From Swiss-Prot:
The gene is tuf1. It comes from Rhodopseudomonas palustris (strain BisB5). It is found in: Cytoplasm. Mg(2+) binds at T26. Residues 136-139 are annotated as: G4. GTP binds at residues 19-26, 81-85, 136-139. GTP hydrolase that promotes the GTP-dependent binding of aminoacyl-tRNA to the A-site of ribosomes during protein biosynthesis. It catalyses: GTP + H2O = GDP + phosphate + H(+). GO terms for molecular function: GTP binding; GTPase activity; guanosine tetraphosphate binding; translation elongation factor activity. This is Elongation factor Tu 1.
């Protein structure tokens, strides 16, 4: 049978399965592809295909992730599934596989377990916007009251971590039943119901081009007779020639005007998300701008020095530190295009952080950086990556 060409005429959304080990994340991923394959919305991908996920590198960290794609009538999805718990932690913190939403898989037979809690907390910390719950293995639970109890527990846990526990859709079913065609109600129908919930409940992410303009500064040149040109890749939004923009980070914020946009040596009237451009700035001196700052829409991003972060610290085997670190640890934090020194403050009751740990910590940078929640960074010592993190909240 000829492969159908994937039409890109549907809105795209990135999701993933999260939850405790052996609660059925990978089986569910396989079941979704099986059920949607009936209507031509996917190619069935078996459990063992997904489970031997290839390794990939993100921010110097090796992570195993499996990617499958499928579509419903409303949307096209890229779905990520990780084989091990450590891969989830790394994935969510580095943003290697950006998630616009996630399906939390909980085994009805076991109820919420330690990693269920940890994945919900991580989803909150790294800013996953919405969750939908699949209560798996319902064919192993005969007592409907027990099912209700597990559902209540899950809702309480979600609320505890600031997700709307009362409103989140919880779909009861069995991934195995769907894969083995044993129970249509808990299998096939539950999967369709789950996808309906995902379609309806996980908000469509705003496309990068529709967001306010931002471009990290990579290089600065002075062109005689024309002025200063700043180069970089536009991260989001659009910059039009003649628009006022701000230079944010490292020093005091300055206003300037973009008087020209150049790409591949051609002049354009605008640059947009994904473009590698040179931006000509009016009245800005070569020494007024440096790598590590950003150009952005005025007022859209502010410089900050203090923030709370969720970080993963590499193990020795991953090329990280061999020893733990303590409060007042001073590494470099690599934001976008540059390193900035910062001081780490560990939470009350945390004596030290071991290689391989993930940790919530407070960081004070020695110079301000254009910063927002969900911004990713690497932790480095003399150019060597020893960790990865994400801004969970800004203090000042």
């Amino acid at each position: 049978m000829a492969k159908a060409k994937f039409e890109r005429n549907k809105p795209h959304c990135n999701i993933g399965t999260i939850g405790h080990v052996d609660h059925g994340k990978t089986s569910l991923t396989a079941a979704i592809t099986k059920v949607l394959a009936e209507t031509g919305g996917a190619t069935f991908t078996a459990y063992d295909q997904i489970d031997k996920a290839p390794e990939e590198k993100a921010r110097g960290i090796t992570i195993s992730t499996a990617h499958v794609e499928y579509e419903t009538t409303n949307r096209h999805y890229a779905h990520v599934d990780c084989p091990g718990h450590a891969d989830y932690v790394k994935n969510m913190i580095t943003g290697a596989a950006q998630m616009d939403g996630a399906i939390l898989v909980v085994s009805a037979a076991d109820g919420p377990m330690p990693q269920t809690r940890e994945h919900i907390l991580l989803a909150r910390q790294v800013g996953v916007p919405a969750l939908v719950v699949f209560l798996n293995k319902c064919d192993m639970v005969d007592d409907p009251e027990l099912l209700e109890l597990v559902e209540m527990e899950v809702r309480e846990l979600l609320s505890k971590y600031d997700f709307p526990g009362d409103d989140i859709p919880i779909v009861k079913g069995s991934a195995l039943a769907a894969l083995e065609n044993s129970d249509a109600k808990l299998g096939h129908d539950a999967i369709l119901e789950l996808m309906k919930a995902v379609d309806a409940y996980i908000p469509q992410p705003e496309r990068p081009i529709d967001q306010p303009f931002l471009m990290p500064v990579e290089d600065v040149f002075s062109i005689s007779g024309r002025g200063t040109v700043v180069t970089g890749r536009v991260e989001r939004g659009i910059v039009k020639v003649g628009e006022e923009i701000e230079i944010v980070g490292i020093r005091d914020t300055q206003k300037t005007t973009c008087t020209g946009v150049e790409m591949f040596r051609k002049l354009l009237d605008q640059g947009q998300a994904g473009d590698n451009i040179g931006c000509l700035l009016r009245g800005t001196k070569r020494e007024d701008v440096e790598r590590g700052q950003v150009l952005c829409k005025p007022g859209s991003v502010k410089p900050h020095t203090k923030f709370k972060a969720e970080a993963y610290i590499l193990t020795k085997e991953e090329g990280g530190r061999h020893t733990p670190f303590f409060t007042n640890y001073r590494p470099q934090f690599y934001f976008r295009t540059t390193d900035v020194t910062g001081v780490v403050h560990l939470p009350e009751g945390t004596e030290m952080v071991m290689p391989g740990d993930n940790i919530a910590m407070e960081v004070h940078l020695i110079v301000p950086i254009a910063m927002e929640e969900k911004l990713r960074f690497a932790i480095r010592e003399g150019g060597r990556t020893v960790g990865a993190g994400v801004v969970a909240s800004i203090i000042e």
